């Protein structure tokens, strides 16, 4: 999944200018993923160009850590919602919609 995420970010950097980035991730070591993803996003200043970022995780309890990490990095939580679609989101039960803080 990290490989896929890398491809998405690389395609964006190489000219696929989009105003959103969709990242789906499901694994036990989500903190390492968050740290690497955050480093990549801020290193390349992707949040300066993205209007929003979706981070979709498989367990809603992980949202607490997400909120802590992104609030500490001045990312506003625009919307938090649950995904319960039985066909498309069988293992996903939370999505965070993040936007760059204007401060």
From Swiss-Prot:
Effect annotated for changing residue 39 to R: In strain: SK1
Protein name as it appears in the record: Uncharacterized protein YGR039W
Lineage: Eukaryota, Fungi, Dikarya, Ascomycota, Saccharomycotina
């Amino acid at each position: 999944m990290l490989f896929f995420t890398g491809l998405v970010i690389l395609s964006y950097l190489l000219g696929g200018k989009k105003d959103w980035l969709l990242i789906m991730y499901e694994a036990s070591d989500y903190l390492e993923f968050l740290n690497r993803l955050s480093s990549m996003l801020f290193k390349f200043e992707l949040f300066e160009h993205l209007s929003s970022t979706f981070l979709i995780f498989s367990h809603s309890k992980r949202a607490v850590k997400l909120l802590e990490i992104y609030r500490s990095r001045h990312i506003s939580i625009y919307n938090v919602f649950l995904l319960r679609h039985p066909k498309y989101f069988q293992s996903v039960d939370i999505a965070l919609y993040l936007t760059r803080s204007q401060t």
